[in-house]
Amino acid sequence: MALIDVIGWVGKRRWARSVGVPMMLAARRIPLATMVRLAGRRICIPSAGYSAIALSGTSVRDNLCDGALMFETLAGAIERFGLEADGTASDLTIEPQACGCPVTMPDYDTPYVSEHPVSTLEDIRALEVPDPLTDTRMRAMVETVRRLSERFTLLTVAGGSGPFTLAAELIGATEAAIYTLTEPALMHELLEYCTRVCATYLDAIVRAGAEVILIGEPTAAILSPGAYAEFSGAYTARLIAAIPRPVILHICGDAGHLVKGMCETGAQGLSLDAPVDLPSVAQTVPDNVVLIGNLDTVSVLLEGTPESVSESTTEMLESMRPYKNHVASSGCDLSYNTPVENIVAMIDTVRDFR
């Protein structure tokens, strides 16, 4: 039995907590890449938070506003899928809403920011840093993490927005891109504020029991390497330096041009989307940085069959066989409507791969 299987077996059993807790405390002293190499086989961590909600028969809206319900939803998915880590559903509207952005929250789809309230320097200076323990939705996520860490001794993965992505929600993505060229001083002041918000929220997530932090910086994909270094990477690096846990950095879409800059942030793991050629990237990424991904969430996992998912998963694993710093995952968050049998096919294929 591989070490990751032992950890998973212990981590799911309440009565084994006296063994699991010391294991998790020991894991905090080990770099993420070392943990991956010691696992004994390839690890699979699909971004299945929204699929877990579908499996539970509850709504996205209810889960993202109720920490206790989200915990029950995720606990059910851990048991159903036999997940090797527990993690919250990705929701990058939490911080924007706490900062004053109106958010539309469908019952069965991902929420989104519907208005961008910031447009001037005066608007930025009027913003306050929300308290994660009193803001309703931040508090719900903190509670979910706390309950997960109290119930399971698995690697609890949780996190939030990166500074540039939060800034883009406050001011608008198009405006954020333009202002990096025309109003850089304004953008830097906004990013200073956003970094404080992210740091405060992620500190609460860590204190609640998260073992690995995931920073989602999807909007940074619109930046050139130089602009990324100045307007995202520098702030992300400051954020990571203040977090006493391994950090995974995710950028959606074709972020291949940003991989070098992502490595320079100090992130111990890079989560890359399906458009990125993972084997090519693996040749340039240091072996102490974990590469996570990157099955296509739509054409493979949403629209495929268990047989085609297994085939695509095997192809990915074979292409990454030379690289021991790889963790199999979906390229991005799985859709609410992703068939359960396709998720199971991916997980089982990874577990059986030797």
Label for each model-derived stretch:
Residues 88-98, 157-166:
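Short, glycine/charge-rich beta-strand/loop segments that flank catalytic centers
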Residues 1-51, 60, 130-354:
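Active-site loop segments of alpha/beta catalytic cores
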Residues 63-64, 98-112, 165-179:
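Aromatic- and acidic-residue-enriched segments that line the glycan-binding/catalytic groove
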Residues 70-90, 204-211, 264:
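Catalytic domains of carbohydrate-active enzymes, especially glycoside hydrolases
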Residues 51-82:
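Active-site-flanking structural segment that lines cofactor/substrate pockets
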Residues 91-133, 147, 154:
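A contiguous, low-structure linker/loop signature
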Residues 49-54, 91-95:
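Short active-site-proximal "capping" loops at secondary-structure junctions
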Residues 66, 120-121, 135, 305:
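Intrinsic-disorder/low-complexity, polar/charged segments
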